C-alpha cells in the first residue's frame, strides 16, 4: 500500500496523480470525512485513556494510604463505557481507511510512459531473427495433435476447460525446460532455489496485493475452519518469506527462485486464448524474487530482467523487451518490463515474462524491513518479482520455432542434456 502520509496530508494531489497515471478514481471527500472522524475520536480516546491512567494511579496511591477510593472508582466507572465505545469506533474507522488504502494501486515511476493499455507500451529492444519457414507453419495445438502430445479432450473430462494433459516426449521437454531454468538461475545468476507451499493463507495474499482486489481470480479451498488459497504465482510465498521480518543489511539483495505450479481462475480473461495452452487454469512457472535496499532496486530490476532474457537467448527464441505504460502495469508495480517471445503461428510476440519493481508497496503491507546500518533503525525494503520464465509458454515457443516439415521438433541445444541427448522429438 501507499504511504499513509499521502492519504492524510495530500489526498487531493494523490487523487490527481492516480487519476492521470492509473485511471483510478479516489473518493477524496469520503476519505477526508473518515480521516476527520478518526482524528476527532482518536483525540477523545487518548484523553479518556490518559484520564483512566491518572485515576488508576490515584486509586493506587489512595489505597496505599488507607484512604477511601470509592469516589475515584465511581468516576472511573462513569467514563469506562465511553472509553470502550470510543476505542471500538476508532478501530472501525481505521479498518475503513485501511480498506480504502488496500484498494489503491501503486504510483508509477517518473520514467514510466503514460498510456491507457498495451497499445501504449514502449518497445525497448529486440533479440534474434524470426525464422523463415519453407513449409506451412503449424501452431502448438496442431503440432501436439499430430504427435499425440497435447490432450485437451482428456483434460476436459478430468477437470474442465483450460487444462491440458501432456504426453510422452513433450511432457519430458516441459520438465526439461523447468530444470534448465532453475539450474541457470541458481548456477549462473545467484538465486537460491526455494521449494514453497502451493497453498497459502489470506495474510500472504494481502501482503503481495492479490487480496482483496483480485479474489475472483483465485482458487480457494476450505476444510473445516481453515481457508487456504492456491497460489497464482510463487511470487506470493517467496515474497512473504520476509513478512514481519527485519533482514540484516549484509543479506541484501536477497534473491530467491522457485519452480512451481500456479493456479488462476482467469476471471477477467474475457474468453481470450481459449485454444491451446496460452492461458490455462493450471500452469508452471519459474519465478524470481528479490528483496533489496531502496537505493538498489532500480539496478536489481534491470538485473532480474536480464536474467529472464538470458533464458530466451540460450534457448534461441526471438523476443522483444517492452516497458509497460501506466495503464498496463500491474496493481503493485512501480515499473514493469515484459518480455514477449515470437510465435510463428500468430506472427506476433506474446508475453512470456513480466519483471516488476514494486518499491516499498508490498513491503509496507507485509512490514518487510531491513536494518539500515547507518541509523541502526529498521526501514521498509523494496520487493521485486519476475517470471524466469513461464514454462508452458516457453514450451509452446520451442514447439513452434523449432518445428520441422514432418511435424517433428528439433530440441534446442541448451535442453539436450536434460533430454538424454535427443536432438529431435516426434
Curated annotation (Swiss-Prot):
Family matches, as SUPFAM superfamilies: Class II aaRS and biotin synthetases, tRNA-binding arm
Chain segments annotated as coiled-coil in the UniProt record: none
GO molecular function: ATP binding; serine-tRNA ligase activity
Residues that coordinate or bind ATP: 264-266, 351-354
InterPro entries named in the record: aa-tRNA-synt_IIb (IPR002314), aa-tRNA-synth_II (IPR006195), aa-tRNA-synth_II/BPL/LPL (IPR045864), Ser-tRNA-ligase_type_1 (IPR002317), Ser-tRNA-synth_1_N (IPR015866), SerRS_1_N_sf (IPR042103), SerRS_core (IPR033729), tRNA-bd_arm (IPR010978)
Pfam families named among the record's database cross-references: Seryl_tRNA_N, tRNA-synt_2b
Subunit comment: Homodimer. The tRNA molecule binds across the dimer.
Primary location recorded for the protein, binned into one broad class: cytoplasm
Annotated catalysed reactions: tRNA(Ser) + L-serine + ATP = L-seryl-tRNA(Ser) + AMP + diphosphate + H(+); tRNA(Sec) + L-serine + ATP = L-seryl-tRNA(Sec) + AMP + diphosphate + H(+)
EC numbers: 6.1.1.11
Species in which this protein is naturally found: Stenotrophomonas maltophilia (strain R551-3)
GO annotations of cellular component type: cytoplasm
Similarity field: Belongs to the class-II aminoacyl-tRNA synthetase family. Type-1 seryl-tRNA synthetase subfamily.
Sites where the protein binds L-serine: 233-235, 287, 387
Gene name for this UniProt entry: serS
Chain's role: Catalyzes the attachment of serine to tRNA(Ser). Is also able to aminoacylate tRNA(Sec) with serine, to form the misacylated tRNA L-seryl-tRNA(Sec), which will be further converted into selenocysteinyl-tRNA(Sec).
Protein name, UniProt field: Serine--tRNA ligase
A Gene Ontology biological process term: seryl-tRNA aminoacylation
Class of enzymatic activity (EC top level): ligase
Compartments where found: Cytoplasm
